[in-house]
């Protein structure tokens, strides 16, 4: 049989291989001299082994040689079929199914092909022969030539080698994205400089503190927190804050209660008298450009709170101080208006009304010029002693001992009812320095004859000083005897001057003395 003949031939070759590593060409032809009729059809193609360069064929099988290249000669179709049989093993050959040691060492190509069978068989995927090797006619078609320069397994490798790992294509896109985030963190939102003055910003910080006083460092922190412009602004703004604290009278330095601890430096607080002024200034800028203020703030919704809030220390002293100021002002006004001359050690006594009638007293005296008998002025200020009505009869002498006391306690009456009836009285009463003027002009008790032998009365009936009605029972309630005398001008001299100063009634020669209240 064929197997026995082949075995005998191979055994002879093996025996001679130990003596000669390079057998003669006759030994190569032993495989080809076998009759074609005795061999099966698949073994007839083995005749190409004597004429084909096996190393060249190995390179083509491994994919290192481009079969479609113009410089490579086209191999015999039988050679490709033999390669397919050797690598894939679809139709096993009796010659190659023997042990590996049966292959003659001196036969070029057989040994290397058998040794490389396992290593070359790993290229076909899944242990199946490629379509190009099974179908030789399609190998030379133009459409299938690009599939053979590289094996299927090798075609998957170049993309990885050229472009790196699967994520190698993506880094150019995420890297700019990350750079954008980092740039945003390094360059935050731009905040413009607030339109508020430094004094307003300092006042905001002090008004929104717990105690109403802060050190300079905490004022800095407040401004940077609520107005981020100062986070990146040059350090010159801190000098401006310190200058405002030192020079602006709206701020005052207070004692640091924690001076005994490690904290050093002074505290600054708002001047309570100027808090309202600062708040008004803040509201003015808010009305002027609210949008600009909001753009400069980290939290624009807190603006109203920063302007209006006050600490407890700024509220408490203001409430009791408000009623005190009007009281003091009223007392001062009353003292100046009344021109009080009363000695504080003396007991209080009723005030007396000082009335000087400026209208001329003659036969045609107008009723409006006199106070009505039922006027409240005499009732409100009763005289120190009972006074009789004026009459043509002489008046009694006053008590000499009580005159000085009465004079000391005389003060002007600010009764609005009396002033409304007689404007001349108002003019006289509002002169706060009246007594100083009288003193400069020589007004004294001695010159006026208050305690001298002056007439005790005047003949009013003879001089015609009675009212126009002629009734003897009527009197002049505005002329009362109090122990103080002065001189009154005659009707002729008074008629020429309407309302005049007090010097016109005092100390003139030829004037008739009359009694004053």
UniProtKB/Swiss-Prot annotation:
Pfam families hit by this protein: Forkhead (PF00250)
A GO molecular-function annotation: chromatin binding
Chain positions covered by the region annotation Disordered: 365-398, 497-517
Alphabetically ordered keywords of this record: Developmental protein, DNA-binding, Neurogenesis, Nucleus, Transcription, Transcription regulation
Residue ranges the UniProt entry marks as DNA-binding: 193-289
CDD domains with a match to the protein in the record: FH_FOXN4 (cd20057)
GO biological process: amacrine cell differentiation; atrioventricular canal development; heart looping; positive regulation of transcription by RNA polymerase II; regulation of DNA-templated transcription; regulation of heart contraction; retina layer formation; ventral spinal cord interneuron differentiation
GO cellular component term, pick one: nucleus
Protein's cellular compartments: Nucleus
InterPro entries according to UniProt: Fork_head_dom, FOXN2/3-like, TF_fork_head_CS_2, WH-like_DNA-bd_sf, WH_DNA-bd_sf
Cited function: Transcription factor essential for neural and some non-neural tissues development, such as retina and lung respectively. Binds to an 11-bp consensus sequence containing the invariant tetranucleotide 5'-ACGC-3'. During development of the central nervous system, is required to specify the amacrine and horizontal cell fates from multipotent retinal progenitors while suppressing the alternative photoreceptor cell fates through activating DLL4-NOTCH signaling.
Name of the protein this chain belongs to: Forkhead box protein N4
Originating species: Homo sapiens
Gene field: FOXN4
